[in-house]
Amino acid sequence: MVQIKQEFIEEMVAHAKADLPNECCGMLAGPDGKVMKVYRMSNVEASPFRFVMDPGELVQVDTEAGENGWELLAISHSHTGSEAYPSDTDVRIAGGTAGLWPDVRYVLVALMDMDDPSVRIFAITNDVVTEEPLEVV
């Protein structure tokens, strides 16, 4: 189970709103399933339908997380007009990242209802999507 502070949820929602009309993306890192930092990443695709993280930023995040003894807990991104559930594209991309980060989770921020955004977390393994509890503290 991933544990995250409410302020980090609010930070991810603010990032999603700021990047409209495009999807935003980021990484969550910390020890023992506890998010210590949310990394706001650049979506070099600049698209409302998909995201591609800046490779240089990925290296920086991976380096900083390693220096702090943290693991990369989750990849986050927003859905600008659909629910907080992995799309077929999300599932396909997750299959490609499994070799790099086999235990990484996927956090989705949905802005279908701008007044009540939805934030959910999933495991995606062998094309199977499983929602997991996200403990907000």
What residue spans do the PLM features occupy?
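Conserved beta-strand-loop surface patch within small alpha/beta domains used
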Residues: 1-72, 83-137
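Histidine-centered divalent metal-coordination motifs
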Residues: 77-81
